[in-house]
């Protein structure tokens, strides 16, 4: 587990630096890319634009660029991702699933950390990957997408492990008690996310 944690930290750092380098290169050649975008395929090109809304959500809601709100959102995003990593790790421990998904979670942490770094510098986000028909993105946006895809794929082995376990545990229970069991079971892992890992086994014991 410690080795995997170190790998995740290293991967997140490399991704952070890659996002910074890509943005730096695009920034240095901003005028050139604006005048003549670089085609990377039929649907993808490098075409830089500054996101003066701050984020996609702010643009959709018409909120605009509010610096302190964006910083708070990025901090909250980081905290949620750390919680999600611990929550998934606890489930992997309980069902003896592979923790390789946590490597993809490093993409999300790196994206949020880079977003926060950009906000604290007091500059607009520079988007430069234009996907035809979808919009303009940057590397951190791609990182977040990869993390979401990874979590969706992880749900497949999780569901295969969880379904027979639940079927055995709630056998013969009425519907209401099944719902109560489900809530209590979920609560175990919500608690585990806030506890040191060496206390997880004691928490899981009665649910084995």
Where would I find each of the regions flagged by the language model?
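Alpha-helical transmembrane bundles and membrane-interface segments of multipass inner-membrane proteins
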Residues: 1-208
């Amino acid at each position: 587990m410690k080795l995997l944690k170190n790998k995740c930290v290293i991967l997140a750092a490399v991704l952070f630096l890659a996002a910074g380098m890509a943005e730096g290169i695009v920034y240095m050649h901003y005028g050139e890319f604006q005048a003549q975008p670089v085609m990377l395929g039929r649907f993808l090109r490098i075409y830089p634009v500054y996101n003066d809304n701050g984020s996609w959500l702010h643009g959709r809601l018409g909120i605009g660029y509010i610096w302190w709100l964006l910083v708070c959102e990025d901090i909250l995003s980081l905290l949620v991702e750390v919680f999600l990593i611990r929550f998934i790790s606890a489930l992997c421990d309980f069902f003896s699933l592979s923790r390789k998904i946590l490597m993809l979670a490093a993409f999300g942490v790196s994206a949020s950390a880079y977003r926060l770094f950009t906000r604290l510098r007091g500059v607009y986000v520079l988007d430069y990957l234009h996907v035809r028909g979808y919009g303009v993105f940057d590397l951190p946006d791609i990182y977040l997408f990869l993390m979401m895809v990874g979590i969706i794929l992880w749900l497949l082995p999780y569901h295969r492990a969880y379904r027979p376990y639940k079927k055995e545990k709630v056998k013969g229970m009425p519907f209401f008690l099944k719902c109560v069991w489900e809530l209590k079971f979920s609560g175990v892992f919500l608690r585990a996310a806030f506890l040191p890992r060496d206390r997880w086994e004691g928490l899981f014991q009665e649910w084995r």
